[in-house]
Amino acid sequence: ISVFYIGSIYSSKNLSKKLEKKSKIFHDPVIDNYLKAFQSILDLGNLRVFVLNEKQINGLVTPNGNIYITQGFINQYKLGKVSGVELTSVIAHELGHLALGHTKKRLITFSAISAISMVISTILSRLLPYIGAIIGRYLSQLLISGLSRKDEFEADSYAAALLIKSGIGTAPQISLLKKLEQLTGVVSSGVTWTLSHPSPEQRINAIKNLEASWITGIK
């Protein structure tokens, strides 16, 4: 497992370097104002967001703390299909992954799962030739997908709390999730247990339930 972990660390550093070469710092007066609010609430230094030169619509954060928004997402913002506050909710979500340690946790967890999967696949291949390795990889994918979905819900919760505390609220977070399938062109199927992300509907319901529980708690 340690060999896989070291390999993951090395791959992560290489990935961070590649992303930095394909990106530039993002500056926008609307977004910058929201970032200043986040900096104040979280007591952060200079919070920088990078534009990654990729066409797909996505946001991500690397273990070294860099937050990236793809050029495809920025293009939708410039076209008016995504508002500044909706784009800010993506940044809040990525901050959630970073603050909750998801990026570093995944290095360890996924490396461990990969190592265990290799052992299981080897054993199953002897018992069930040809299909044993396929079953092992499938089980590994189920575990990884389940953990990834859990992280997404947690990052959404963190983002919701940050957006509420900054005076923005969860409305832009929910409105973006509602249009996410249309923007990405990827429609969620009814079966989500093999997917890395929960469906937009599941995420919206979780945010609404969470906010309702906070309001009830205040009362």
Residue ranges of model-derived segments:
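A Zn2+-metalloprotease active-site environment signal
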Residues: 1-198, 202, 211-218
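Cysteine-cluster motifs in flexible loop/terminal segments that predominantly coordinate metals
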Residues: 205
